[in-house]
């Protein structure tokens, strides 16, 4: 079983909202076969607390417009790592140092990547990596 079409379209809507707020290193991972709780993890990086807040707020608004209801939001006060659960999609917005330290891509490397539109990944990645979302594809 792979991520549903609905989960994939929500993921793209969330990724577009994050990209509009200059989120970097966008990656989408299909965790549907490993987790019964959700289909997709969307990962995004923000430069600092204010940037993370702006990304999360934009994603929240886009998901609301798309009809997804937020179940829970964790970590917003500190804004080092914010997790927002929309049921089929869980969005993780991390500051760079936390993203590197926790290395969620590496933890879920056995799960397939969900290809994001090239305009979202190319424009918002500092080093040009992560087209399709997986920076660790060569590792």
Over which residues does each language-model region extend?
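Long, contiguous binding/interaction regions
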Residues: 1-33, 47-54, 61, 66, ...
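P-loop NTPase catalytic core of nucleic-acid-dependent motor ATPases
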Residues: 36
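A short beta-alpha structural unit
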Residues: 39-40, 81
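Short glycine-rich or small-residue beta-strand-to-loop segments that form or flank ligand, phosphate
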Residues: 40-46
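Extended, positively charged loop/linker patches that create polyanion-binding surfaces
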Residues: 69
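Active-site beta-strand termini and strand-to-loop segments that position acidic
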Residues: 84-86
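Active-site beta-strand-loop-beta-strand hairpin of nuclease catalytic cores
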Residues: 89
């Amino acid at each position: 079983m792979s991520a549903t079409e609905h989960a994939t379209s929500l993921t793209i809507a969330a990724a577009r909202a994050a990209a509009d707020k200059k989120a970097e290193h966008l990656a989408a991972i299909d965790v549907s076969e490993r987790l019964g709780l959700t289909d997709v993890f969307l990962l995004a990086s923000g430069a600092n607390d204010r940037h993370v807040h702006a990304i999360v707020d934009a994603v929240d608004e886009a998901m609301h417009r798309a009809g997804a209801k937020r179940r829970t939001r964790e970590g917003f006060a500190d804004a080092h790592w914010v997790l927002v659960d929309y049921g089929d999609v869980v969005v993780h917005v991390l500051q760079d140092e936390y993203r590197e330290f926790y290395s969620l891509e590496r933890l879920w490397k056995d799960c397939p990547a969900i290809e994001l539109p090239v305009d979202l990944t190319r424009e918002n990645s500092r080093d040009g990596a992560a087209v399709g979302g997986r920076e660790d594809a060569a590792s």
